[in-house]
Amino acid sequence: MKSLEQSSNKDMLFEVFMARFDILQKNRQSFISIYEGFKKSPQQLIKLLPSFLESMIISAELAAFNVNGFKGTIRLKGLMIVYFATFFIWLDDNTTSLEKTMMALDKNLNHAEKFGKFLSWVILLVILILK
């Protein structure tokens, strides 16, 4: 098995996000109760966005993703979407191994990677057209 440092960015991000879900899993009912509270009072969630953003930046940096500049900002927003999409699967994942969560995270990361490549081409085309 490769060490985390020898893994691809995507593999490292998978490991970082799954570590987060493992932590959530240890206190599953508490986190689900907190989530249910946010559904009743969504304005409370807004107060946590700066902390969540910071935690996403740290997660990205642990996975050796550059989140600086314009491209990094887009990448960070994509990572947040991946995390939230996977979080909603985790809410319904009653397996002890979190296999549904792992499959969803892998699928979401694959989609994000494809979208990122597509977006890079679009940005390149726009730059070439504007020159």
Language model segments and positions:
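Hydrophobic/aromatic-rich alpha-helical bundle segments in the mid-to-C-terminal region
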Residues: 65-127
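Hydrophobic alpha-helical connector segments
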Residues: 1-33, 40
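Generic structural signal for well-ordered, non-transmembrane alpha-helical segments
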Residues: 18, 22, 50-53, 106, ...
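Extended low-complexity intrinsically disordered regions
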Residues: 29, 124-131
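Acidic/His metal-coordination segments adjacent to aromatic residues that form catalytic metal sites
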Residues: 2-6, 61-68
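Short, solvent-exposed positions on alpha-helices
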Residues: 11, 29-32, 46, 73-74, ...
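Short, hydrophobic secondary-structure boundary micro-motifs
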Residues: 32-34, 68-69
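Amphipathic alpha-helical packing segments from all-alpha helical-bundle domains
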Residues: 42-65, 73-85
